[in-house]
């Protein structure tokens, strides 16, 4: 499941997710439940059996404190009654739109809730601050750089995501009243990532896996059997969603791509990009 904002880049990237879902054969064992801003015309979205579209106002528009933080929309829909649309499923992958399922996604069946990996807690300042907050909130910190994508039992992911939202609000109120900070140090721009790490350790403790999701799109290794889901990271290395958006892949010889290689697979699925 994912949220499609009324943004042409996100709408285009949702197309990547759908094409990868089809090519990888994931459509055989899963459905896509896509929540979207009401302004998004579903006639502009892929029509495939197994895809359900549910309109819902963006969380950032309905809650003034998040007006300048659209990333909250990828979580906010879990707090609405409409999330009941996923309740009949056993498991769910909560993902962003700018992602690619691999042919191995069909084999993902972990015993524990599985997260991807992030890259927001590399500076000592950030690691220390997260540990201090965890202690203040009564959380035992174990992991760092827990990713944004998560796969697990539906009821667990719904509960976890609502805790995640609550922690986003707490961080906003306690840590970012007087400024936004500066990347790669303590920075409001990745507040939802900090909150996700704290929420994961609060709710799951040690009973979680990290890996197999949010694989680096810039990797030039072959897709491994435990690479289930690739994320388009913020990078100008191939594969780069920024270069894709700006048309820098328009002249690429697609016949020369090797879709068994992670970076090439992403471009092969995404296509040449906008004119």
Q: Model regions: which residues?
A:
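N-terminal anchoring/stem segment of glycosyltransferases
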Residues: 1-70, 81-89
């Amino acid at each position: 499941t994912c949220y499609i904002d009324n943004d042409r880049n996100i709408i285009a990237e949702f197309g990547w997710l759908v094409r990868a879902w089809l090519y990888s054969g994931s459509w055989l064992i899963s459905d896509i439940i896509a929540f979207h801003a009401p302004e998004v015309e579903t006639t502009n979205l892929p029509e495939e059996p197994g895809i359900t579209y549910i309109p819902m106002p963006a969380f950032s528009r309905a809650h003034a404190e998040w007006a300048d933080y659209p990333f909250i929309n990828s979580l906010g829909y879990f707090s609405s009654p409409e999330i009941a649309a996923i309740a009949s499923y056993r498991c769910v992958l909560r993902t962003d739109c700018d992602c690619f399922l691999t042919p191995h996604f069909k084999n993902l069946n972990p015993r524990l809730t599985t997260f991807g990996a992030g890259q927001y807690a590399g500076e000592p300042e950030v690691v220390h601050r997260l540990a201090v907050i965890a202690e203040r909130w009564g959380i035992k910190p174990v992991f760092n750089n827990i990713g944004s994508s998560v796969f697990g039992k539906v009821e667990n992911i719904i509960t976890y995501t609502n805790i995640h939202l609550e922690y986003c609000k707490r961080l906003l109120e306690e840590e970012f009243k007087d400024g936004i900070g500066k990347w790669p140090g303590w920075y409001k721009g990745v507040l939802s990532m900090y909150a996700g790490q704290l929420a994961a350790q609060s709710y799951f403790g040690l009973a979680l896996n990290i890996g197999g999701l949010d694989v680096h799109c810039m990797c030039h290794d072959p897709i491994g059997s435990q690479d289930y889901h690739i994320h388009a990271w913020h990078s100008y290395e191939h594969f780069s969603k920024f270069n894709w958006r700006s048309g820098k892949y328009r002249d690429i010889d697609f016949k020369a791509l090797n879709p068994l290689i992670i970076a090439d697979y992403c471009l092969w699925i995404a296509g040449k990009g906008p004119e």
